[in-house]
Curated annotation (Swiss-Prot):
One of its GO terms (biological process) is translation. One of its GO terms (molecular function) is structural constituent of ribosome. NCBIfam families: PRK04191.1, uS3_euk_arch. It comes from the Archaea. Binds the lower part of the 30S subunit head. Residues 17-86 form the KH type-2 domain. This is Small ribosomal subunit protein uS3. One of its GO terms (cellular component) is cytosolic small ribosomal subunit.
Length: 304
């Protein structure tokens, strides 16, 4: 079987089974069903206002339902479980059945519809819509719609948060269709929002600001500490450079003095031919032969 036909077949089986349960369990307050296919078989959960009537005396009714489902719909090892609906006013199928029953008993359709809507909204529903169609008054068919609260009509939220129910009321003039749509109190609407109060905003805003302030102070302290360390290192480097420069200058002066002394000693010990010597203010000078000027003996002679 193709995938498309498989989906169509599954939908047909579920719709037919829902109609069968609604007909067989009308007195028990039938409120819908779920089908879950597992490796152990097919699990069918039936929701009802009176689950005891679904089970029956010694399980007689539920065994009969299981045999009929297996015979009519050819399911794999069907197992039926009955669950009680705690709040029938929030179950769309139950309210549709009640509305149809009220109309069949002779209630005016508008009164029955408003009473049903009032019960649904008093139970805490976010929205409710009731549509009654058929020969309401007169010989022509028409549609009567009643809406209260918030209702979605299209899109994915319709499948997620809107509960649908449908039932028929048989009158002398014809059949009336009763459709009920309910949005439960715990449903999350797609356009819902909530304003935060001042305390929540204060807690959300103050904490990051305080953290930023403390972080900023810590950063400033770290920067100042790094600056002080850098200044101290620079001062140590400058002092070391000055000390090295002074040491180099002293070494140069000592070397120059030693060279001068060595030159003087050399000059005193070596005397050239035709050279004249004299002492002026403690400085020895000499004059070479053939020259008319005197100069210190420690001066280097330029070779000619």
């Amino acid at each position: 079987m193709a995938v498309e036909k498989k989906f169509v077949q599954d939908g047909y089986v579920k719709a037919s089974m829902d109609e069968y349960f609604a007909k067989q369990l009308s007195r028990a307050g039938y409120g819908g069903m779920d089908i879950n296919r597992t490796p152990m078989g097919t699990q069918i959960t039936v929701y009802a206002e009176k689950p005891g009537m679904v089970i029956g005396k010694a399980g007689k009714v539920i065994r009969k339902l299981t045999r009929d489902v297996d015979r009519l719909y050819d399911l794999d090892n069907p197992q039926i479980d009955a669950q009680e609906v705690k709040r029938p006013e929030l179950n769309a199928q139950m309210m549709a059945s009640r509305l149809a029953s009220s109309i069949e008993r002779g209630w005016y359709f508008r009164k029955a519809g408003h009473n049903t809507m009032r019960a649904v909204m008093n139970a805490g529903a976010l929205g409710c819509e009731i549509v009654i169609s058929g020969k309401l008054t007169g010989s022509r068919s028409r549609v009567e719609k009643m809406v209260n609260g918030y209702i979605k009509h299209a899109g994915k939220p319709v499948d997620d948060i809107v509960d649908d129910g449908f039932a028929t009321a048989v009158k002398k003039l014809g059949t009336l269709g009763c459709k009920v749509r309910i949005i439960h109190p715990d449903a999350v609407l797609p356009d819902s929002y909530r304003l935060k109060n001042a305390e929540e905003l204060g807690s959300l805003v103050s904490t990051p600001v305080e953290e930023e302030k403390s972080a900023g102070i810590e950063e400033l302290v770290e920067v100042e500490a790094k600056g002080e360390v850098a200044e101290a290192e620079e001062a140590v480097v400058e002092e070391t450079a000055k000390a090295e420069a002074e040491t180099v200058e002293e070494t140069v002066e000592e070397v120059a003095a030693s060279e001068v002394e060595a030159d003087m000693i050399t000059g005193e010990s070596v005397t050239e031919e035709g050279e004249e010597r004299r002492e002026v203010n403690g400085v020895w000078q000499h004059k070479h032969g053939g020259h008319d000027y005197w100069h210190p003996t420690g001066r280097m002679h330029r070779e000619s």
